[in-house]
Every structure is written in structure tokens, then in C-alpha cells.
Regions:
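Short amphipathic recognition helices of helix-turn-helix/homeodomain-type DNA-binding modules
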Residues: 61-68
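A short, Lys/Arg-rich alpha-helix, primarily the initiator
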Residues: 1-14
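Short alpha-helical DNA-recognition segment
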Residues: 16-35
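Residues within the helices of the helix-turn-helix
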Residues: 9, 20, 49
């Protein structure tokens, strides 16, 4: 059975944070967050680690799409 993968927006919504709050927790600008959420930029390994740590979502359940 395939595990459900959550993207950065789904995780933010589950955490009940605004984009500004999520960007702050990730240590990135809101513009950078928006580019990640819209698939315009590829997530860096450091951002993935931070997202995992603040959300508790296992790495393998975080959807990290390639840059379009």
C-alpha cells in the first residue's frame, strides 16, 4: 500500500500556520516559501530537514517534487 505523501502546503495547513509563520519557522523568506509551495523551486535538503523537525512528518511522507 502506497503511503500518503504530504506537500509543504498540506503540512502548513495541518499545523494551522499562515505562510508567513511557516516561512519563519523554516528560516526562509515568504517569497522562497511561495516558490516552494508553487513548485517553482526545488526544496533544499536543509529545508526538508527543518520541515521534518518542525512538523514531525517522517521524511518519506514529505512530497518533494522536482522543480518544474
Amino acid at each position: 500500500m502506497e503511503e500518503l505523501k504530504l506537500n509543504i502546503e498540506a503540512i502548513r495547513t495541518q499545523m494551522k500556520l499562515t505562510r508567513l509563520e511557516m516561512a519563519g519557522r523554516l528560516g526562509i523568506s515568504v517569497d522562497r516559501y511561495n516558490r516552494l509551495a508553487n513548485g517553482e523551486s526545488k526544496m533544499l535538503a536543509t529545508e526538508l530537514v527543518c520541515l521534518h523537525r518542525i512538523s514531525g512528518v517522517p521524511y518519506e511522507n514529505i512530497d518533494v517534487p522536482e522543480k518544474s
